[in-house]
Structure formats: C-alpha cells, structure tokens
Amino acid sequence: MKSRDTLIRLKKFQVDEKRRRVAQIEGMIAEFERMAADLDREIKTEQERAGIHDPAHFAYPTYAKAAMQRKENLKRSADELKVQLDDARAALGEAFEELKKVELLDERDQARERAEENAREQADMDSIGLMRARLGAIA
C-alpha cells in the first residue's frame, strides 16, 4: 500500500505540474494579446496624430510601422503558444487519466481489504456464537 500511496502522490504532483504549465502558457498568451491591443491603440493614436491611415503612404509614421511589426510578432508568438497550449492540455489530460487509474486501483484494493476484514470479523463472531451455543447446550 505504501508504494501505491507514493505513486498516487507522484501522479498528483505530475498533474499539478502540468496544470501550472497550462496556466503559465495561458498567462503568456493573455499578456501577448494585451500588449498587441496596447500597440493597436498606439498605432491608431499615431495615425490620428499624423492624419495618415494608409501604411503604404510615403509619409506614414515610422513609429506606427514599427508598432505594427511588433504587433504582428506578438500575434505570431501568441499563435505559437496556442499550439504549445494544446499540447500542454493534452499532456494534462493524460496525466489526469493516469492519476485516476491509480486512484481507482487503490480504491479497489481498499475495498477488497475491507471485505476481507469484514469476512474475518464475521467468522470470529460466528465462532463466538457457536461456542456460546455449545456452552448453552451443555449447561
């Protein structure tokens, strides 16, 4: 049983690690999306300030062009992280399934041990009852 308890603790630790990884990736994606939204606002502000909204225009603000490039890089990075997130979620699901298998085996073993203990107790009680019945018949 002790080895099973250790295995359960290990599986729980693995599930927790995978949950942390999923949360970390989700946080990074959210941060990249927030930064991209901030850059979007800055681009709009710069376009309004310059009065030019066409990126192909020769006088389009350089800062707005650079901000657009950074925004695209952030979106590309967020998309790459989404692939990693899918993988991390799949790994979390697998780790959770493994944990459940081990827990079910442990529950089954405990139920079997309880049934065996109950059977032993019942046998003891039966033998006590039988002895009392014999003593009562003798007396």
What are these regions (language model features)?
Residues 1-139:
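Charge-rich amphipathic alpha-helical interaction elements
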